[in-house]
């Protein structure tokens, strides 16, 4: 038998965290001034008129750096709880964590060999 009343606090949190942003958007839409003057629609660049097109294309190497950063950031999120409870978990979890780290090291070496970490 499932005891759904144990999840009441979760549903309250979910409803409140959904209602607050919706209310914020509605209130800002009602209270914001509606002026569509040319000054409001123009680009603003450090107090002077912009030169050229405002859209700039980024090179793919920046995305590769961001992707490698995200991978190792996620690794930190997974390894921190493991490190905090290392003495309780035992040898099998230690071996699993080593396999996880080895897979990430293989991915880093692959990205390094492919030149994804080269800045020039």
UniProtKB/Swiss-Prot annotation:
Keyword NADP: yes
Superkingdom to which the source organism belongs: Eukaryota
Molecular function GO labels: NADH dehydrogenase (ubiquinone) activity; quinone binding
Biological process per Gene Ontology, one example term: photosynthesis, light reaction
Enzyme class: translocase
Keyword Translocase included in the entry's annotation: yes
Keywords: Chloroplast, Membrane, NAD, NADP, Plastid, Plastoquinone, Quinone, Thylakoid, Translocase, Transmembrane, Transmembrane helix, Transport
EC number annotated for this UniProt entry: 7.1.1.-
Membrane-spanning ranges: 9-29, 64-84, 88-108
Gene Ontology cellular component terms for the protein in this record: chloroplast thylakoid membrane
Topology in the lipid bilayer: Multi-pass membrane protein
Enzymatic reactions: a plastoquinone + NADH + (n+1) H(+)(in) = a plastoquinol + NAD(+) + n H(+)(out); a plastoquinone + NADPH + (n+1) H(+)(in) = a plastoquinol + NADP(+) + n H(+)(out)
Localization annotation: Plastid, Chloroplast thylakoid membrane
Coiled-coil region list: none
Signal peptide: none
UniProt cross-references to InterPro entries, sorted A to Z: NAD(P)H_OxRDtase_bac/plastid, NADH_UbQ/plastoQ_OxRdtase_su3, NDAH_ubi_oxred_su3_sf
Quaternary structure annotation from Swiss-Prot or TrEMBL: NDH is composed of at least 16 different subunits, 5 of which are encoded in the nucleus.
Function summary: NDH shuttles electrons from NAD(P)H:plastoquinone, via FMN and iron-sulfur (Fe-S) centers, to quinones in the photosynthetic chain and possibly in a chloroplast respiratory chain. The immediate electron acceptor for the enzyme in this species is believed to be plastoquinone. Couples the redox reaction to proton translocation, and thus conserves the redox energy in a proton gradient.
Family, as annotated: Belongs to the complex I subunit 3 family.
Protein name (record): NAD(P)H-quinone oxidoreductase subunit 3, chloroplastic
Species assigned in the record: Cucumis sativus
Gene: ndhC
């Amino acid at each position: 038998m499932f005891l759904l009343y144990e999840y009441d606090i979760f549903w309250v949190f979910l409803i409140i965290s959904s209602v607050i942003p919706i209310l914020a958007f509605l209130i800002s839409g009602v209270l914001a001034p509606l002026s569509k003057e040319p000054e409001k629609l123009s680009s603003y660049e450090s107090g002077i008129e912009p030169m050229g097109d405002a859209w700039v294309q980024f090179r793919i190497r920046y995305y590769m750096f961001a992707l490698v950063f995200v991978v190792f950031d996620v690794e930190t999120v997974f390894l921190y709880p493991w490190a905090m409870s290392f003495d309780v978990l035992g040898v099998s979890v230690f071996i699993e964590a080593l396999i996880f780290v080895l897979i990430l090291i293989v991915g880093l070496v692959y990205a390094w060999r492919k030149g994804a970490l080269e800045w020039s």
